[in-house]
Amino acid sequence: MIKNLARTFGALSLALVPLLSSPAAHAAAPAAPVAEVTTLADAVGLVKVTEEDRTGYTRTKFKHWNSGDDKSDGCNTRNEVLLAEAVVAPTVEAGCKLTGGTWVSYYDGQEVTSAGSLDIDHMVPLAEAWDSGASAWSAARREVYANDQGADVSLVAVTARSNRQKSDQDPADWMPPSPEAQCRYVGEWVSTKLRWGLTADDRELEALKVYAEGPCEDTIVRYTPVV
């Protein structure tokens, strides 16, 4: 009888081992990044300051445009952004060719009715991103950055002219010609820097502070960090 009880308790103890061990085998998944909302002045204060270095930069270090967020729609990132930002939707033909449609380029306030007249601008230009920390990223992370549709402000459809004028300059050297666009632009610039953990140089930071402490003091910045 004692031997039978011993066997029974032994079997029960073995059966309990996986039950007791199971929580450890299913560790909780890391929490998703939380969206941050703050004033422009506070957001500017979160941007780290370092010297910029463009050594080794080429645009080919940032693969774009890739096949976009929806791999089944036949559209690349450029066309997906155009579709998302159209105020009048274009017709999508075979091969994701876009015809018709209307867009408003907020940099200069221009209405555009031809997709071919638009550039998709990286809010923080690729060269500026390289200077500000992306030079240390993997090629895969740089590709994600160059095609980032996870935040509405990362990529923006604007007139080719305004995009060429901007080139790879930061707000110390270029701002949208439309005064109504400038606070939005500064907010989206800072949002992108914080989203990707990019730094600023001294001149850039001082320019951002001028807007944050002056005409754009009521601007709100929203961003979700990329991990």
Residue ranges and their predicted role:
Residues 1-29:
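Secretory targeting and sorting signals
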Residues 51-126:
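Secreted/periplasmic proteins that engage bacterial cell-wall peptidoglycan
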